[in-house]
From Swiss-Prot:
The keyword Flavoprotein does not apply. Disruption phenotype: Cells lacking this gene completely degrade cholesterol to half the yield of wild-type and accumulate HIP. Belongs to the ATP-dependent AMP-binding enzyme family. Pfam families: AMP-binding, AMP-binding_C. It is an enzyme of class 6 (ligase). It catalyses: 3-[(3aS,4S,7aS)-7a-methyl-1,5-dioxo-octahydro-1H-inden-4-yl]propanoate + ATP + CoA = 3-[(3aS,4S,7aS)-7a-methyl-1,5-dioxo-octahydro-1H-inden-4-yl]propanoyl-CoA + AMP + diphosphate. Transmembrane segments: none annotated. Keywords: ATP-binding, Cholesterol metabolism, Ligase, Lipid metabolism, Nucleotide-binding, Steroid metabolism, Sterol metabolism. InterPro entries: AMP-bd_C (IPR025110), AMP-bd_C_sf (IPR045851), AMP-binding_CS (IPR020845), AMP-dep_synth/lig_dom (IPR000873), ANL_N_sf (IPR042099). ATP binds at residues 185-193, 398, 413, 504. This is 3-[(3aS,4S,7aS)-7a-methyl-1,5-dioxo-octahydro-1H-inden-4-yl]propanoyl:CoA ligase. Involved in the catabolism of the rings C and D of cholesterol. Catalyzes the ATP-dependent CoA thioesterification of 3aalpha-H-4alpha(3'-propanoate)-7abeta-methylhexahydro-1,5-indanedione (HIP). The gene is fadD3. One of its GO terms (molecular function) is ATP binding. It comes from Rhodococcus jostii (strain RHA1).
Amino acid sequence: MTEQPTTTPSALKRAAREFGELTAVADGDVRLTFTQLHDRVRDFAAALSSQDVRPGDHVAVWSPNTYHWVVAALGIHYAGATLVPINTRYTATEALDILERTKTTALVVAGNFLGTDRYASLRDESSTFDLPTVVRVPVDGGDAELPGVFDFDDFLALADEDTRAEADARAAAVSPDDVSDVMFTSGTTGRSKGVMSAHRQSVGIAQAWGECAEVTSDDNYLIINPFFHTFGYKAGFLVCLLNGATVVPMAVFDVPKVMATVHDEQITVLPGAPTIFQSILDHPDRPKYDLSSLRVAITGAAAVPVALVERMQSELSFDAVLTAYGQTEAVVVTMCRTDDDPVTVSTTSGRAIPGMEVRIGDQGEILVRGENVMLGYLDDPESTAKTIDADGWLHTGDVGTLDDRGYVDITDRLKDMYISGGFNVYPAEVENALARLDGVAESAVIGVPDERMGEVGRAYVVAKPGVTLAEDDVVAFCKERLANFKVPRSVRFVDSLPRNPSGKVMKNVLREEKK
């Protein structure tokens, strides 16, 4: 293979050259080879040029996982513009805030999807909302024609010989240090921040991920993680672009559909939160599907019990189960390798990927430094300076340990720690104990006010199907395994835990409900 590319346009050109007739994207009935993907991306970039979108402009995508997202994102880059992904769970108010803050000049937006017309919601939210270029993605169908709004295929048809030549010139001019995207943090506390990354970083992350997971052109890569999140984008379809693997996007998570897709598409790589794999393992229809093609799983965002790793390997035929750690500000920091044993995978988040350093700072905070640390927050130098110190160390806000091998164990978030009777309590320690209680599918622990202790723990517990647990059972189990100040004083049984798109539990939501 030729020298590694450092921009997504150069990665696309290399993929078309080296993997040409292999399948790049398999989205239902739509099958695109790498050559066809290149041509559609080029046409999308040419169409942007025809609409006066300039290099450096911000272009947003607010749409679920379909092949259109891949074409649009790479087309935005090919045109020299900056991609702004928008969370499909966002309300029109939240989306408008991002569009305004980024001064977006064009928007790619889903039509009717899960009962919502996102473009209509934007117009309803603001009577002054107006963008010069809006491209609508057909998802559920039945979209009425709207003046000034291009349907996706009609937009591609705007490309002509002159605009394609302009697009090629812009793609060739993209620099490794140009901003490739502005990814907004989940905003679980306060206002979300726009994280800026360079092309070399986005491509470098995908390269490291692909190397650790040993992704090749023989792989079929099911992407359930949203494209608007780094897990679906930089650790998703960009990995496939670099390695010639096939992207199989899934717009809505559904366990039977996941199993059917693994069966039909011979999926080999399946990234996702631990709950995805637990749901597959526990589903009564699992024996109906042939899941033997599965080769590697990459997970994280929550504790991964050793028993789950072992079941994934013995019952789902995974040759390797990997965990990884990162955040929007440094997408992939550490990652396990395919030869790591189940205990290492379960108890750590791997070791630093090439180009990254990790050390433990004050209060056990994990600090990271290296090539893939963000350029900074959009229009927010003050927050950037607070997050990245003068020596270039990114302060993650995560608490953890580093063993002699360089493997990281993420124990908690600094902000999730609470103080009970003068003692620091890290909820993840309690949650790890609860994971060993028979009948517990998952749990989340927060601190709640207490007159005598200051704060005490409250556990939110999701029981496994068909299992009945009592509060006394949970408390008694913890008392046998934890110091008294760590034992939850109350337990709430819930059907599910609130999660952000990366699969992390949104404890701020639980705190709002604590009364």
